[in-house]
Structure formats: C-alpha cells, structure tokens
Amino acid sequence: MNLYTRLINKDHPLPPDYVPENLTDIGIPFDAPCGDPKRLLEIRTAHAALMLIQAAQRESLILTGISGYRSYKRQQQLCIGHSNPASSTPYQQISPAPVNPYVALPGTSEHQSGLALDVSCPAVNHELITEFAETPEGKWLVRNASLYGFI
C-alpha cells in the first residue's frame, strides 16, 4: 500500500520517525512565515493545493494555508497543549480520547503524511473555526476540493 491509499487513524498510526521524503513549500499563500515546517506538503499534494487555490482566486476567493505537514513531535506538543495544562505528561498517557476531537493523537494525523492541508480565509480572520463553512470560500471548497484530490 502506498502513502496515497494508506489509512491513517488511531488503529493505523504512522510510526514516530515517519517523515515524507518529498516535502516542499510550493509558495501558496500561507498564514506562516517562509521556513515554517507547516508550509510543507508532499510534492503532489503541494501541486494540487496550488491548483485549488489558483482556481479559487479565479473566482475572487481567497484561501490561505494554515497547516500542512506536522511532525509526530509537533503533534505531541499540540496534544499536550489540549490536555491538562498543569501536567507535563504526554497527552496519550493522560487520555485515550482527545479532549478536543479535532486534535489527533501523535501518529494518527494525516498532517504527518504531508497529504493534509488546513485552509481558511480572511472572512474568519484565517482561523480554523466552523464558521468557515458558511463563507463563500468554505462553500466553494465543499463543491471543488474533490476535483483536486482533497476529501
């Protein structure tokens, strides 16, 4: 099974040392400075994201990348931040289920594969919030993401 058809979840995690070989920053608009690892995507995914964002721009819509590649270690840090702030115990040792269902356990996030990209738009201040779905960009993304390989 190759990376493009691999199931990544709590039952099928990526190993802690997994890093995609062909990560790249293709230069899409991003809410992160150049050199930030979250700008990275697997090369084919990066090209698809560029085409998606350019298609949105042709319709006067602005999509901004928020988070692409995320290492196992970075995912651990995010989980610790969403657990008991008074504890320095790694998240997966405190709780078998996320406190925040949108924060995956380390190894279970598709971001570690380099195939996932979170996007937002100016109408919601480039935040990752549910109100994005009601913006013109969010509605456009629902209709068009699959045309570029995103589900």
PLM region spans:
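Extracytoplasmic cell-surface/polysaccharide-interacting catalytic and binding patches
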Residues: 1-68, 72-151
